């Protein structure tokens, strides 16, 4: 294990292993924590990507660099469904730094010819995900429900997201690595709307959970992306 902000160890590992494929999934993924410690967030979510790309260039490695990114880079979408051409206007420091990482990949591809690929994931859920309240709302709600704890859902659940199961995310990543065109961006998503009042209804059917519908906090209102669904036809065109 290596801390991706420890550039000395990270560089030595890349130099020693000379990877054919480097999949960058490491990072700080809580938008609230990105406001608490913004300098750390730029180190782990942006500078780490730049360092890896520069190291691959310096060593002249024939390495496919694959960056995992997030739907948060979009901010509040201007138009739905979102696709690879949608305008990005992130509302959080985390989102801004992830978008910066994407731009580093594009620049190193266009200027130096590095084989870079980017994928963005919508709200994923499934086993072995970290259960952190301010990190992955869907997994947190599911976990709390099956523990029998009360859960809060904002705004009567009258908003929807594009939820995707982790096994589908994995097959999407594999497809992009095998068939993706270098320098390109792909969305990994279900392409379907899931309303949160519907999610709440499912949880009450399969558990003893009690749901409270509450107003969202002021902070959430400022940064939340709102309704979100993706057109994933570009990934499907690869045979996914």
Segment roles from a protein language model:
Residues 4-44:
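NAD(P)H-binding glycine-rich loop region in Rossmannoid oxidoreductase-like domains
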Residues 93, 97-100:
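Active-site helix of classical SDR
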Residues 146-240:
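C-terminal substrate-binding subdomain of Rossmann-fold SDR/epimerase-dehydratase oxidoreductases
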Residues 80, 103-162, 166-175, 202-206:
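NAD(P)-dependent short-chain dehydrogenase/reductase
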Residues 5, 29, 73, 124-126, ...:
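Conserved sequence/active-site signature of Rossmann-fold short-chain dehydrogenase/reductase
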Residues 24, 50-93:
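Conserved Rossmann-fold NAD(P)-dependent oxidoreductase catalytic core, especially the SDR/UDP-sugar
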Residues 26, 66-70, 91, 120-122, ...:
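Active-site beta-alpha turn of Rossmann-fold NAD(P)-dependent dehydrogenases/reductases
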């Amino acid at each position: 294990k290596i801390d991706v902000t420890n550039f000395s160890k990270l560089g030595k590992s890349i130099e020693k292993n000379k990877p054919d494929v480097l999949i960058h999934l490491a990072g700080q993924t809580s938008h609230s924590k990105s406001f608490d410690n913004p300098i750390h967030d730029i180190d782990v979510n942006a500078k780490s990507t730049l360092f890896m790309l520069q190291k691959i260039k310096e060593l002249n490695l024939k390495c496919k660099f694959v960056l995992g990114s997030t739907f948060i880079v979009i901010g509040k979408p201007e138009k739905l469904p979102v696709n690879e051409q949608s305008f990005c206007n992130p509302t959080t420091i985390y989102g801004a730094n992830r978008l910066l990482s994407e731009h580093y990949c594009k620049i190193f591809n266009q200027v130096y010819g590095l084989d870079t690929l980017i994928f963005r994931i919508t709200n994923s859920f499934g086993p072995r995900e970290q259960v952190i309240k301010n990190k992955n709302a869907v997994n947190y709600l599911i976990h709390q429900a099956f523990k029998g704890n009360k859960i809060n859902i904002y705004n009567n659940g009258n908003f929807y997201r594009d939820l995707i199961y982790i096994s589908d995310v994995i097959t999407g990543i594999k497809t992009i690595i095998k068939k993706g065109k270098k320098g390109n961006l792909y969305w990994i998503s279900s392409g379907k709307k899931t309303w949160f009042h519907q999610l709440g209804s499912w949880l009450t059917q399969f558990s003893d959970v009690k749901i409270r519908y509450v107003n969202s906090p002021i902070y959430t209102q400022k940064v939340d992306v709102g309704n979100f669904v993706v057109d994933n036809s570009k990934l499907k065109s690869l045979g996914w």
